A protein has these predicted regions:
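N-terminal membrane-entry
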Residues: 13-18, 31, 145-162
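Cytosolic-side ends of inner-membrane transmembrane helices, especially those
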Residues: 29-36, 162-178
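Membrane-proximal alpha-helical signal-transduction linkers
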Residues: 176-189
């Protein structure tokens, strides 16, 4: 002998699971939106490091008295909170962290050249330094794309699970509620 369960209780459980999946989708969407803002800012700031390093070379050649204040600005960009946050993210790939550390180390040497107005040495190192910055920007972009792919995949799987669950609830209601009502209606005629 098997125990009969309440149809309404069973349907309520299925609908509760649907609500849980909707909560997951909503939470993930909010996390992705918040993350995108900081990712875009990190890419923007790190991309500006290229232009700032070239501008610093021009400043060294044309107006050496402004070099120190441009070095301070560059250092502020290099140590921006959003870039430091990327370094501390739990899931940030090691490539991003290594690229950022490489830029920090290389910049210490580049800033020394700028401070003592060694234009030739700064110029000689500039192209490879900018390549390191480009590599860092590329790593950030790839990480952002990977996060998007993961988020979209989770959203799609959740939506498919919701669709499957709702389809099952409809089928179950037809079998357990609608069919017996139809049989009762036919029997009463």
């Amino acid at each position: 002998m098997y125990a009969k369960r309440s149809v309404s209780t069973r349907i309520a459980k299925y609908l509760f699971v649907v609500i849980i999946f909707m909560g997951i989708i909503s939470s993930l969407s909010l996390i992705v939106m918040a993350s995108n803002k900081s990712d875009a800012e990190a890419i923007n700031i790190s991309g500006s490091l290229r232009m700032q390093s070239y501008r610093l070379l021009t400043e060294m050649e044309r107006s050496p008295d402004t070099v120190e204040q441009n070095l301070v600005r560059y250092q502020d960009s290099l140590n921006a909170n959003v870039l430091l946050t990327v370094q501390n993210q739990l899931f940030a790939p090691s490539g991003i962290k290594a690229s950022y550390q490489k830029i920090l180390q290389r910049w210490m040497m580049m800033s020394d050249f700028a401070r003592v107005h060694q234009i030739e040495k700064y110029h000689a190192e500039l192209k490879s330094y900018v390549q390191d910055v480009d590599d860092f920007v590329l790593e950030l972009q790839r990480f952002t794309e990977l996060k998007w792919i993961i988020a979209v995949s989770v959203l799609c799987v959740s939506m498919l699970l919701i669709l499957a669950m709702v389809s099952y609830v409809i089928w179950y209601m037809k079998r357990e509620v609608v069919k017996p009502l139809e049989l009762m209606t036919k029997a009463s005629m």
